[in-house]
C-alpha cells in the first residue's frame, strides 16, 4: 500500500499557474510601463478596427495589424522580464531563455500570417472593388503611426532589438540603404542619420503611413479606389519581407544550430585547447545557441595519466568561456591497462588450462574512486570511461569456457584448439622464433604443450 496523505496539497490549474506567474512579473516596477502600454494598445487597436469597418479600407486594416504586432512585442518583453526573474530548475537546467526565442518566433510568424490574409483579401477586392470612405482614413493612419513609433522608441525590447541586429537585412532595408547612400552623396551631413542600419520596425511604420497618405490623396482627388487595394498589398509585402528574416533567425536558434559567424572562432578555440599541456585529444564537441546572445556546449577531453584534472579543466573552461556561457566538460585519462590474470582455486573438473579460454573481466570500481568534479576515475588502474558507462557484466567474475571442439584424427595434432598464448609463444610455427619470444596479450600466458597430448596420452611422432 502506498503512503496515505491526509492533507494533500491541491494541484493548481493551468490558469492558476499563469496568474501566479503574472503576479510575479507585475510585482516588478519595470513591468508597469509595459503593462500601461499594453492597455493603451488594446484601446487604440479597438478604435482602429472600428475605423477600418467604417472606412471599408483594407489598407488601414493591414496597417492596424502592425499595431497588433506591437501588442505581441510587448508580451515578448514581459516574457523577457519573467525569464530574468526565474532561475533554472531541475527540469529546465538551462533556464528559460528559449521561451523568449519562442515568443519572437511566434510573433513574427503571426505577423506573416496576417500579411498573407491581407494578400488573399486584396486579391478578392481586385475582382470587385468596393467604395472607400476617407472620413477616418487619415485620422486612423496618424493615430496608428504615433502609437507604433512611441511604443518602439519608448520600450526597450531586448529580444526584438537583438534579432533585428543579428538577422539578415530585409529587402526594404536594402532599398532604403541604397537611397540613403545616394542622398548622403549629395548632402554629406545626413550620413549620421541615414547611413546606419535603420530599425526595421520604424521603417515599416513610416513606409506604411506613407502608402496610406498617398491612398488618401488619390481617393480624394480622383476617387481611385483601387489604390487602396494596391497599398494594402504593398504594406503586406513589406510586413512579410521584414518579419521573414527574423523568423528564420529565431527558428534556427530553436533548432539548436551554431551561428555561422562564431564557427571560425570556435574552431580556433578548440585548436588552442588541444595544444594545452596534458591534453591528448578533444572530441565530441557540440555547440548550439541557447538563447539570444548565449551559447551552450559540451566537449570531451582526453588527457595524460599524469596530468592534473583540475588544472586541465580550469584551462579548458577559461579558453572556451569567452564564447560559450554554458559549458559542460568531461575529462577522462588515457588509461589503457591489461586485464588481470585469473586468480583463485580452479574447479576439479577442469583438466588443463591450455584446453580452456580464460576471459578475465575487470571489476567495477566503487563510487569512492570517482572524482566528484569531473566524474573521472581517479586511480590509474580504472578502465577508460567510454567503456565504463552502462557496460553489462562488470560485476561478473572471470569466466572459464570449456573448449569442446576437436580436430580430426590422423594428423598428429591435438584435439583442442591451440591456445592463443601458445601460438604466439611458439612464434606461429615460424623457424627461428623460439618459445621465449612470446607476446603479451590479454589472455593467460600458460606454458604451451607443443608436442604433447595429455588427453589421449600419445606422444607426438
From Swiss-Prot:
Pfam families on file: Cation_efflux (PF01545)
Cytoplasmic side: 1-33, 86-98, 156-200, 245-461
Tissue specificity of this protein: Expressed in brain; especially in cerebellum, hippocampus, parahippocampal gyrus, superior and middle temporal gyrus. Also expressed in B-cells, colon, eye, and lung. Lower expression was present in bone, brain, cervix, ear, heart, kidney, muscle, nerve, pancreas, prostate, skin, stomach, and testis.
Bilayer-crossing regions: 34-54, 65-85, 99-119, 135-155, 201-221, 224-244
Region of interest: Disordered: 371-392
Result for mutant: residue 205 to A: No effect on heterodimer formation with SLC30A5 and no effect on zinc transport
GO MF entries: antiporter activity; zinc ion transmembrane transporter activity
Subcellular location, principal: Golgi
Keywords from the named record: Antiport, Golgi apparatus, Ion transport, Membrane, Transmembrane, Transmembrane helix, Transport, Zinc, Zinc transport
GO cellular component assignments: Golgi apparatus; trans-Golgi network membrane
GO biological process: regulation of zinc ion transport; zinc ion import into Golgi lumen; zinc ion transport
Residues on Extracellular side: 55-64, 120-134, 222-223
Subcellular location: Golgi apparatus, trans-Golgi network membrane
Annotated InterPro entries: Cation_efflux, Cation_efflux_TMD_sf, CDF_SLC30A
Keyword Transport: yes
Topology of this chain in the membrane: Multi-pass membrane protein
PANTHER family, per database record: ZINC TRANSPORTER 6
Similarity field: Belongs to the cation diffusion facilitator (CDF) transporter (TC 2.A.4) family. SLC30A subfamily.
UniProt cross-references to NCBIfam families, sorted A to Z: CDF (TIGR01297)
Role played: Has probably no intrinsic transporter activity but together with SLC30A5 forms a functional zinc ion:proton antiporter heterodimer, mediating zinc entry into the lumen of organelles along the secretory pathway. As part of that zinc ion:proton antiporter, contributes to zinc ion homeostasis within the early secretory pathway and regulates the activation and folding of enzymes like alkaline phosphatases and enzymes involved in phosphatidylinositol glycan anchor biosynthesis.
Quaternary context: Heterodimer with SLC30A5; form a functional zinc ion transmembrane transporter.
Protein name, as recorded: Zinc transporter 6
Organism: Homo sapiens
Species lineage: Eukaryota, Metazoa, Chordata, Craniata, Vertebrata
Encoding gene per record: SLC30A6
